[in-house]
């Protein structure tokens, strides 16, 4: 768990934490990638008054995804910044601020950041990765990896309606 002790934060005004979170803490399989190393989290939490607190830091881990062309597993480094601004529930009750703002309650004693960490990881993963810029992918006809084997499938004939455009592209 990744929690900020609100009583300590209220007393010290600032908390700095460096933690490693195991990848098993997050079920990201439904998003098409997996975390292949512990997540390194560096945080600095601080507050200037009783109405708001800020958590800033960085997240770093290794991510394994499939190449978008040949489906080979590709491991890449993911680094992102964390910048969260929370408003106390008491301050939201007395103001006209939007209720969808990140909230905290001093009386709870701690602020759990795991959900926010999960969200930042999922939102910052690249949608597509390639094992190599020159990856040739897989054959649409037979499914062979064209990086390893030559395919004997015949080239599909182009629809004759495209011929006019093909003539113009060769000029």
Describe each region flagged by the PLM.
Residues 1-171:
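Structured interface patches
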């Amino acid at each position: 768990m990744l929690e900020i002790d609100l009583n300590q934060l209220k007393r010290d005004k600032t908390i700095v934490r460096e933690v490693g979170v195991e990848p098993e803490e997050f079920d990201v399989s439904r998003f098409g990638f997996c975390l292949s190393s512990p997540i390194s989290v560096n945080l600095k939490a601080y507050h200037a008054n009783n109405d708001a607190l800020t958590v800033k830091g960085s997240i770093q881990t290794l991510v394994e995804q499939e190449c978008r062309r040949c489906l080979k597993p590709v491991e890449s480094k993911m680094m992102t910044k964390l910048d969260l601004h929370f408003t106390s529930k008491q301050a939201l009750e007395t103001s006209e601020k939007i209720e969808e703002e990140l909230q905290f309650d001093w009386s709870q004693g701690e602020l759990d950041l795991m959900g926010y960490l999960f969200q930042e990881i999922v939102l910052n993963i690249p949608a597509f990765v390639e094992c190599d810029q020159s990856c040739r992918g897989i054959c649409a006809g037979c499914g062979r990896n064209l990086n390893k084997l030559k395919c004997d499938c015949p080239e599909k004939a182009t629809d004759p309606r495209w011929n006019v455009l093909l003539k113009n592209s060769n000029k």
